[in-house]
């Protein structure tokens, strides 16, 4: 039954949408192989760092995810999805290579958390914004978004599980090699990704007409001015829409609670459960099971007859 549910979203997707789902799945799986084991695991097990260090890693990671998402959104608006995707690939590969080259000292790992967070945030529009470059049909958008959500949750299972096996066989830093492999696979999957020119033009037109200030900034030769206006427009859009504002608050509070425990989780594995760094991946992947089941259920409800 579960297999049939997994095949259901793909059967209704266009070829371009399938490319998009594969791109997101592969690049996000790469990130999932590396964050918990590669950053937090290295600090806890290899460096024997303190809770302060893991807390800083989580803080830096999440702050730069936000900054990266702002930068990624601005880059997408300015250059379109194909160039944005190539920049996301380059950023992920450069991050993995830098962490591998410069070693596992605590300061280097914290810098790695910064780079990884920015790269992850920069790539986030692949999931959130690319579907609108393929279609404006509400039903098709719902199918694409549901498939992306489901396979993103599959990444939460696959990534840490594979990362655990790599860490068990080699070291916690070796997971960044795995991240780079998945990034290259994402590039291969995205090679045939061709957003319709008309859709891209229409979206750029919508962005240009979203406000007089944004229009002026888009014509400006100063990229930083355009980026700042884009950020301000995005924030205004969220907080002037009650549904988006409520969704923002729900996501913020849920992640706030998760973030409070995140720096301590690795010490629980090491000092209470007395397991190796590989178990950080294997046990954390279990949280993805419920996420996948929830995404599949949402997809089933969306596909039910009579749904808007």
Residue ranges with predicted function:
Residues 1-17, 195-248:
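Juxtamembrane intracellular "pre-TM" segments in multi-pass secondary transporters
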Residues 19-36, 61-76, 80-92, 108-168, ...:
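Substrate-agnostic recognition of the 12-TM MFS/MFS-like secondary transporter fold
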Residues 90-104:
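C-terminal ends and interior cores of transmembrane alpha-helices
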Residues 174-192:
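Symmetry-related core transmembrane helices of the 12-TM Major Facilitator Superfamily/SLC fold
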Residues 50, 80-81, 105, 171, ...:
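A helix-boundary/kink motif common to multi-pass secondary transporters
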Residues 2-63, 243-287:
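Helix-loop boundary and gating motifs at the non-cytosolic
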Residues 45-47, 78, 130-138, 268-273, ...:
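Helix-to-coil boundary motifs at intracellular loop junctions of multi-pass secondary transporters
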Residues 98-100, 116, 189-190:
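MFS-fold secondary transporters
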């Amino acid at each position: 039954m579960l297999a049939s549910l997994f095949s259901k979203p793909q059967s209704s997707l266009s070829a371009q949408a399938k490319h998009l789902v594969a791109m997101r799945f592969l690049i996000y799986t790469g990130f999932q192989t590396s964050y918990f084991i590669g950053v937090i695991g290295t600090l806890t097990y290899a460096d024997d760092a303190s809770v302060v260090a893991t807390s800083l890693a989580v803080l830096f990671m999440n702050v730069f995810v936000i900054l990266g998402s702002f930068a990624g959104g601005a880059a997408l608006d300015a250059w379109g999805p194909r160039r944005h995707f190539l920049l996301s690939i380059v950023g992920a590969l450069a991050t993995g290579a830098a962490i591998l080259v410069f070693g596992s000292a605590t300061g280097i790992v914290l810098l790695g958390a910064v780079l990884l967070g920015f790269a992850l945030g920069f790539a986030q529009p692949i999931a959130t914004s690319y579907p609108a470059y393929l279609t404006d049909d509400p039903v098709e958008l719902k199918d694409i978004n549901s498939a992306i959500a489901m396979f993103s949750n599959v990444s939460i299972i696959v990534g840490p599980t594979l990362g655990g096996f790599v860490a068990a066989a080699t070291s916690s830093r070796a997971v960044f090699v795995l991240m780079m492999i998945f990034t290259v696979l994402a590039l291969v999957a995205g090679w045939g990704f061709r957003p319709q020119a008309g859709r891209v033009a229409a979206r750029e037109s919508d962005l240009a007409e979203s406000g007089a200030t944004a229009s002026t900034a888009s014509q400006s030769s100063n990229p930083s001015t355009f980026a700042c206006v884009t950020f301000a427009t995005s924030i205004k859009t969220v907080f002037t829409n009650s549904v988006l504002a409520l969704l923002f608050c729900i996501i913020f509070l849920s992640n706030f609670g998760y973030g409070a425990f995140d720096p301590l989780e690795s010490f629980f594995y090491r000092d209470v459960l007395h397991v190796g760094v590989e178990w950080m991946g294997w046990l954390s992947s279990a949280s993805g099971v419920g996420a996948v089941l929830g995404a599949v259920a949402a997809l089933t409800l969306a596909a039910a007859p009579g749904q808007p």
